[in-house]
Amino acid sequence: MKTGLRIALVLLAIGPCSGSFCAARAQSETGCILRVHVDGLRNVKGVVGVLLFRSADGWPEDVSKSVRHDASPIAAGPRSATVVFNGIAAGDYGIVALHDENKNMKLDRNLFGIPKEGFGFANNPHVGLGPPPFRAAVVYVGCPTTDTLIHIIYK
């Protein structure tokens, strides 16, 4: 009798939902939140756009191959922005950010193909003559919330 009572009290204390089962259920019902914080902007013109990729296909500029994309205004004081993605599935995402100063929804380049606007990648990998490989900019997004910081660079 005492053992049954102890089990009942333990189950009552734990509650009806605990462990990874309920975490998985909550994730499937609401999805995860990803907050991409972007700093290092040279001015407050335009917006900061962020693209999420699940694979190297289209990486890093093909918006049509990104699984999600969004933009955010730039905060005047710190010259930073945060783009929030709600309801995304947990998993690995390659993340790229763009300081779209003229709001034309693309990375403007000069005659030599060098970007005229700022850009950056998750994990802030070294950028040489081309974009880093997809795997270098992958972040695992877990529930309930994941935050990542991207430093914008200008060439």
Annotate the PLM regions.
Residues G77, A89-A90:
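Surface-exposed loops/turns
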